[in-house]
Amino acid sequence: MANICTTTIYVEGEKESVEKLNTLFDETISNKNNLNDKVNDNNTWIGNLLLNKGLFPYKYDTHRAFVCEYGEENDTTFYVLMESAWDEKMEAMDAVFDSVDKNMKPYYFAEECAMEYYVSNDIENKYFGDYYVDWFEEDYDLAVSSGELKRCRELVGDETFYTAKELRSSLAKLLHDPFTKLDKLIEKINDREEYNPEKTGISLGIHKIKKVTK
């Protein structure tokens, strides 16, 4: 089984285009038009979106790529969560979006944590920042008794994506260290030299997102 890459996409466009995109997903997932691939036998396969627009799916990399969630985020933004083998399948998804409206603008974040793969095209940090942060209670009782669960909730919060400035501010307060450079702090945290879960009960991981223009 290939490593699973999770991709989150926000697609911006005109209200009418977002509605058309939502209809395409609805009709594809339900196989309303009976156009879905019979061999693949999974209506959530992204190749079916291409088939429903009269496009040839095997022109693109659609390997083990499936829609998990989708919907209208608001009148001008559509949301997609998908899983695929190894990496994001944005060439195929771009073809889907272009088939509805070539002026639609997708922003995506792809994560394959086993390979330390964190990639986004969101250069503007509109949806996805410079860093991806995840934390959890490795030892709940210790996290509570040490007071670090409360501090982590207050200073790191439930956010997943941070700009460099936001992250530096949070870590300076969390670690009582306003002087060490951000990259060095992140290295120490990920190596468990700083904020060690054996002392805090909290497992904290910080990953820099590679920004691409494609």
PLM feature segments, named:
Residues M1-K214:
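Intrinsic low-complexity, intrinsically disordered or marginally ordered coil/linker segments
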